C-alpha cells in the first residue's frame, strides 16, 4: 500500500494544526513499513516555502529531514509534466495539486491492487477528482475545513 502526501497534510502535521493526529497516523504507518510514503518534489517545494514563511528556512529543512527519517520519499515528477499539464487544463487545480494527482495516478498505474491513496486537506482543488471516474478511489481527506 502507498500514500502520496499533498503539502497540506504535511504542514498540518509539522505545525500541529487541525487534523495533525490523522496525518500522524499515516506517517506512523510509513515509519513502521506498513505503507510506502511519497511526496512529489513540487509539493515538497510548496511545503518548504510555506514552512519557511511560518517559521524559518532552517525549521522548514528540519521538518523535511524529520519526514525523510519517518520514511517519506521524494517522488520525482520530471516525467509527469505532460500529464500534470493535461490535468491542469482539464480540471483547473493548482499546478502543485495537479502534480500530486499525477504522482498518485502514476503510482496507481503500477499497483495491480490499486492501493494508492493521495492524502489531501480541505482545498477544493480536489473536489472534481472525488467525482471523476479513475480518480475517486485515490483521494482521501484528513480534514474537511481549512486551518
Task: Please state what every model-predicted region is.
Residues 1-39, 52-62:
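Short, well-structured N-terminal submotif of metal-dependent ribonuclease cores
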Residues 2, 73, 101, 109-147:
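Acidic, PIN/NYN-like endoribonuclease modules and their adjacent C-terminal/linker elements
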Residues 7, 41, 97-101:
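Conserved glycosyltransferase catalytic-site signature
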Residues 10-11, 44, 126:
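A generic structural signal for short hydrophobic patches within well-formed alpha-helices
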Residues 37, 70-90:
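Acidic catalytic patch
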Residues 51-77:
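Helix-adjacent hinge/juxtasegments
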Amino acid at each position: 500500500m502507498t500514500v502520496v502526501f499533498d503539502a497540506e497534510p504535511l504542514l498540518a502535521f509539522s505545525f500541529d494544526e487541525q487534523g495533525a493526529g490523522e496525518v500522524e497516523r499515516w506517517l506512523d504507518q510509513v515509519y513502521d513499513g506498513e505503507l510506502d510514503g511519497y511526496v512529489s518534489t513540487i509539493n515538497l517545494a510548496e511545503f518548504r516555502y510555506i514552512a519557511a514563511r511560518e517559521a524559518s528556512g532552517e525549521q522548514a529543512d528540519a521538518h523535511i529531514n524529520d519526514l525523510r527519517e519517518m520514511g517519506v520519499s521524494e517522488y520525482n515528477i520530471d516525467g509527469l509534466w505532460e500529464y500534470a499539464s493535461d490535468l491542469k487544463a482539464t480540471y483547473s487545480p493548482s499546478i502543485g495539486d495537479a502534480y500530486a494527482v499525477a504522482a498518485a495516478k502514476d503510482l496507481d498505474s503500477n499497483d495491480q491492487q490499486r492501493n494508492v491513496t493521495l492524502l489531501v486537506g480541505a482545498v477544493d482543488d480536489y473536489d472534481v477528482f472525488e467525482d471523476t471516474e479513475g480518480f475517486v478511489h485515490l483521494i482521501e481527506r484528513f480534514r474537511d475545513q481549512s486551518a
